[in-house]
Amino acid sequence: MGHKIHPTGLRLGITQEHRSRWYASSKSYPTLLKEDDRIRKFIHKKYGSAGISDVLIARKADQLEVELKTARPGVLVGRQGSGIEELRSGIQKTVGDPNRQVRINVVEVERVDADAFLLAEYIAQQLEKRVAFRRTIRMAVQRAQRAGVLGLKIQVSGRLNGAEIARTEWTREGRVPLHTLRADIDYATKVASTTYGVLGIKVWVFKGEVLGDEAQQQLPVGATPRRRAGRRPQQFEDRSNEG
């Protein structure tokens, strides 16, 4: 069953959290759900170059809180926070309420090559540049291993290398225990648009097991997480709507 069900949905409330955190009546629930979907599509379309890994949305009364996990926070923040103001205006326009209070938090992803969505995005970019899929997968696996992941599985489907007949190829390195509920599995999908058609990409990343409140992450011997020298993870919290 663990191989059929969505890895994130299976672990909600155990090792994964909901992407939308709010409660609503049955009457307003569909409207708010569609609103969340529009916000996410707007952010990924407009800021695709910022390496956005995840978008978390929370609601408190009439306030909307959006948390962005990104590999390049500087692209979102901009000079003196101008990017935040532009993003807020875009979200207000997307929801159709220019007076909506929007609070934005930008969080930098610590280990870029250990993030499933960013890995899938990297693979899609390489495939769209017509790089051979086997070479692309091998490079992605090497990047993830250097980042210190415990296991990785990558699957690519479609007309690989322009073949006449579509097929599915996959590879796995290390452990990816899909049946273990306490396993911290990061899962993402991505679509690559090529001249031969679209290719579907799926990435599973095993980061360790969560026992109690702490994640037991055992880095492989010699593994060194890929981080830019001299920089620490940053979190930019937007407080312009307070007071």
UniProtKB/Swiss-Prot annotation:
Region (Disordered) residue ranges read: 217-243
Q: Name one GO molecular function term.
A: mRNA binding
For this chain's UniProt record, which GO biological process terms are given?
translation
The record ties this protein, via SUPFAM superfamilies, to:
Prokaryotic type KH domain (KH-domain type II), Ribosomal protein S3 C-terminal domain
Instruction: Using the record's annotation, list all stretches that form the KH type-2 domain.
Output: 39-110
| Cellular component aspect of the GO annotation | cytosolic small ribosomal subunit
Q: Which InterPro entries match?
A: KH_dom, KH_dom-like_a/b, KH_dom_type_2, KH_sf_prok-type, Ribosomal_S3_C_sf, Ribosomal_uS3_bac-typ, Ribosomal_uS3_C, Ribosomal_uS3_CS
Bias (Basic and acidic residues) occurs at: 234-243
Q: Which domain of life is it from?
A: Bacteria
- Keywords assigned by UniProt, alphabetized: Ribonucleoprotein, Ribosomal protein, RNA-binding, rRNA-binding
Q: Which family does it belong to?
A: Belongs to the universal ribosomal protein uS3 family.
Q: What does this protein do?
A: Binds the lower part of the 30S subunit head. Binds mRNA in the 70S ribosome, positioning it for translation.
Q: Which NCBIfam families match?
A: rpsC_bact
Q: How does it assemble?
A: Part of the 30S ribosomal subunit. Forms a tight complex with proteins S10 and S14.
Give the protein's recorded name. Answer: Small ribosomal subunit protein uS3
